[in-house]
């Protein structure tokens, strides 16, 4: 419609009246459109008269009035423009309405989306809270269960302690009464004890203390080993005379006895030496008491005021004849037999091989002494003066060497190499005897074959303070190669050679028997050849036996060579040669009988 208006304006400018007429005709044709728009005009425009654009009315308008037509056309143009503006406003209003509706819908959708997201977040948070609460509840339950278990364990472990506390809180009056009785009995029995044992107890109060301590400890539990205790038993009339502990609660006694048993079980290993050290200490104390009693009997005038007479008497007795020494040795042997019989028998069963680990490091040196002293019996066969020398040596060194070697030497096996060891031991002890007789004391140079705990009697009397435990190696490595180890290795090698020789002889005899059986099957023409073969074999055996004998003599000379003055002659093994000749003669006789 706007296009028609623009066309009409351009047409008016070119053709004045003709264009106007055509325009009016067109406007009449569109009269129907104007009627429709008229209802949409505002109220202020209703006063304007509607245009009559119909073409039928063209004849009714006078043609000669151009001014009126122009006015009418201008009015129509204005109306058209107004209509266009109104339409624009309507379109804009509709657009705005639609835009507002769309924005509202979009906002509603956004709000709904936000609400959904918020609800989802809230659900997630609730789930997380629920999970956390569950975890906290589970942790609390676990803690409660652990606490209950701990309480149950404590209740199971500590009912005895509560009972002990209750029992300990009771015995106060009984303790006081027993202490008073003990003090009274001690004060009453102190005078006769001091009068009877003034000689030994006065100089050695430590022995009395150890005896009392052992009685207090060993009343509740029996001694762990079969040895006799180190204290003297009280007289039967004084049964109430016993030392008490600080607390007289009964469970404490049980605990101490159990602890003692545990310690004994733990220290049953041969590497540990506490169990043996108790026995050895008691044995040393008894030897010391016997020595004192012998000194006091030899010099009855001497008492507590003259303690230096003991070592002088002992040194004087070293130079006395052998008969006085033998009586003392017998006393010591009988006394030691009661204490160390079981231990000596157990030590005899040990295998002392230098190739094996040193298991007996924690024990005393009695094992080596048992090995060396077992040769006294054989020495009595070869040398009748050896037992006398051994007895005199033992008497002169009775304070340092334990008497178990004298007791076990009566049951030793015969062995030539052990005789060599005994001779070396006697020589070393004679050297130390000369040093003692001259007035010196051997401190640095001691024989490796002698005992480790050797102490002179004078030093034993003068040494009152307790000694430290001797240090020992803690490794299980074999001992260094000493003279004992070398001799043992040589002895084993010689035994191996003898066994090999016997095996070869047995093989040779089997061959001879097989040949004899074959010759019996063959004709009699080969008998002379068989006899010659047998004669040649006998000659070969005699030569081999002579060679072996010369080798054995050379080996003994080599063994005794490094020791210098020590040489032991070994007799040739005649028994084996006699057995060989006897077997050969029997074979010849059997062969001759079969031939005939």
UniProtKB/Swiss-Prot annotation:
<feature type="compositionally biased region" description="Basic and acidic residues">
    <location>
        <begin position="522"/>
        <end position="536"/>
    </location>
</feature>
<keyword id="KW-0156">Chromatin regulator</keyword>
<feature type="region of interest" description="Disordered">
    <location>
        <begin position="522"/>
        <end position="596"/>
    </location>
</feature>
<feature type="region of interest" description="Disordered">
    <location>
        <begin position="214"/>
        <end position="258"/>
    </location>
</feature>
<dbReference type="InterPro" id="IPR024643">
    <property type="entry name" value="Hist_deacetylase_Gln_rich_N"/>
</dbReference>
<feature type="region of interest" description="Disordered">
    <location>
        <begin position="132"/>
        <end position="172"/>
    </location>
</feature>
<dbReference type="GO" id="GO:0005634">
    <property type="term" value="C:nucleus"/>
</dbReference>
<comment type="function">
    <text>Devoided of intrinsic deacetylase activity, promotes the deacetylation of lysine residues on the N-terminal part of the core histones (H2A, H2B, H3 and H4) by recruiting other histone deacetylases. Histone deacetylation gives a tag for epigenetic repression and plays an important role in transcriptional regulation, cell cycle progression and developmental events. Represses MEF2-dependent transcription.</text>
</comment>
<feature type="compositionally biased region" description="Basic and acidic residues">
    <location>
        <begin position="132"/>
        <end position="153"/>
    </location>
</feature>
<dbReference type="GO" id="GO:0006325">
    <property type="term" value="P:chromatin organization"/>
</dbReference>
<feature type="region of interest" description="Interaction with mef2">
    <location>
        <begin position="172"/>
        <end position="222"/>
    </location>
</feature>
<keyword id="KW-0539">Nucleus</keyword>
<keyword id="KW-0678">Repressor</keyword>
<keyword id="KW-0805">Transcription regulation</keyword>
<keyword id="KW-0378">Hydrolase</keyword>
<protein>
    <recommendedName>
        <fullName>Histone deacetylase 9</fullName>
        <ecNumber>3.5.1.98</ecNumber>
    </recommendedName>
</protein>
<keyword id="KW-0804">Transcription</keyword>
<dbReference type="GO" id="GO:0141221">
    <property type="term" value="F:histone deacetylase activity, hydrolytic mechanism"/>
</dbReference>
<comment type="subunit">
    <text>Homodimer. Interacts with mef2.</text>
</comment>
<comment type="similarity">
    <text>Belongs to the histone deacetylase family. HD type 2 subfamily.</text>
</comment>
<dbReference type="Pfam" id="PF12203">
    <property type="entry name" value="HDAC4_Gln"/>
</dbReference>
<feature type="compositionally biased region" description="Basic and acidic residues">
    <location>
        <begin position="160"/>
        <end position="172"/>
    </location>
</feature>
<feature type="compositionally biased region" description="Polar residues">
    <location>
        <begin position="586"/>
        <end position="596"/>
    </location>
</feature>
<feature type="compositionally biased region" description="Polar residues">
    <location>
        <begin position="541"/>
        <end position="558"/>
    </location>
</feature>
<feature type="compositionally biased region" description="Low complexity">
    <location>
        <begin position="293"/>
        <end position="312"/>
    </location>
</feature>
<feature type="region of interest" description="Disordered">
    <location>
        <begin position="293"/>
        <end position="313"/>
    </location>
</feature>
<feature type="compositionally biased region" description="Pro residues">
    <location>
        <begin position="221"/>
        <end position="237"/>
    </location>
</feature>
<feature type="compositionally biased region" description="Basic and acidic residues">
    <location>
        <begin position="567"/>
        <end position="585"/>
    </location>
</feature>
């Amino acid at each position: 419609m706007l296009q028609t208006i623009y066309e009409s304006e351009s047409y008016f400018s070119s053709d004045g009246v003709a264009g106007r007429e055509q325009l009016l005709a067109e406007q009449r044709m569109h009269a129907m459109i104007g009627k429709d728009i008229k209802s949409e005009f505002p109220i202020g425009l209703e006063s304007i008269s509607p245009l009559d654009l119909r073409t039928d009315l063209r004849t009714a308008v006078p043609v000669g009035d151009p001014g009126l037509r122009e006015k009418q056309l201008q009015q129509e143009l204005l109306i058209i423009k107004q209509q266009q503006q109104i339409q624009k406003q309507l379109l804009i209003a509709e657009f705005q309405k639609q835009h507002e509706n769309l924005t509202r819908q979009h906002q509603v959708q956004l709000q709904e989306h936000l609400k959904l997201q918020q609800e989802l977040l809230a659900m997630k948070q609730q789930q997380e809270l629920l999970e956390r609460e569950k975890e906290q509840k589970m942790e609390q339950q676990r803690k409660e269960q652990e606490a209950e278990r701990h309480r149950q364990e404590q209740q199971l472990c500590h009912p005895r302690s509560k009972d002990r506390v209750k029992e300990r809180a009771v015995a106060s009056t009984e303790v006081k009464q027993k202490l008073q009785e003990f003090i009274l009995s001690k004060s009453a029995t102190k005078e006769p004890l001091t009068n009877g044992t003034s000689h030994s107890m006065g100089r050695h109060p430590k022995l009395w203390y150890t005896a009392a301590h052992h009685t207090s400890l060993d009343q509740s539990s029996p001694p762990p080993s079969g040895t006799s205790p180190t204290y003297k038993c009280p007289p039967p009339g004084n049964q109430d005379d016993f030392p008490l502990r600080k607390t007289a609660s009964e469970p404490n006694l049980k605990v101490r006895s159990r602890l003692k048993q545990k310690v004994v079980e733990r220290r049953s290993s041969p590497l540990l030496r506490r169990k043996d050290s108790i026995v050895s200490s008691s044995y040393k104390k008894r030897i010391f008491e016997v020595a004192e009693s012998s000194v006091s009997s030899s010099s009855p005038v001497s008492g507590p005021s003259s303690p230096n007479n003991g070592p002088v008497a002992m040194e004087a007795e070293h130079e006395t004849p052998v008969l006085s020494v033998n009586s003392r040795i017998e006393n010591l042997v009988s006394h030691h037999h009661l204490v160390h019989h079981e231990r000596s028998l157990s030590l005899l069963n040990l295998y002392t091989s230098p190739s094996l680990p040193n298991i007996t490091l924690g024990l005393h040196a009695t094992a080596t002494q048992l090995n060396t002293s077992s040769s006294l019996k054989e020495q009595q066969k070869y040398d009748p003066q050896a037992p006398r020398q051994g007895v005199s040596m033992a008497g002169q060194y009775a304070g340092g060497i334990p008497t178990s070697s004298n007791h076990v030497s009566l049951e030793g096996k015969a062995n030539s190499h052990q005789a060599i060891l005994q001779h070396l031991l006697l020589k070393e002890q004679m050297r130390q005897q000369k040093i003692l007789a001259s007035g010196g004391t051997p401190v640095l140079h001691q024989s490796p074959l002698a005992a480790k705990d050797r102490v002179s009697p004078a030093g034993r009397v003068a040494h009152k303070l307790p000694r430290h435990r001797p240090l020992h190696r803690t490794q299980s490595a074999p001992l260094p190669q000493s003279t004992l180890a070398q001799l043992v290795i040589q002895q084993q090698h010689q035994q191996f050679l003898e066994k090999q020789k016997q095996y070869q002889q047995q093989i040779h005899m089997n061959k001879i028997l097989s040949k004899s059986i074959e010759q019996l099957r063959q004709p009699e023409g080969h008998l002379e050849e068989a006899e010659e073969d047998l004669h040649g074999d006998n000659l070969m055996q005699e030569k081999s036996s002579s060679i072996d004998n010369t080798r054995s003599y050379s080996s003994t000379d080599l063994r005794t060579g490094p020791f210098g003055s020590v040489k032991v002659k070994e007799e040739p093994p005649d028994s084996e040669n006699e057995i060989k000749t006897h077997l050969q003669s029997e074979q010849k006789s059997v062969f001759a009988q079969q031939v005939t």
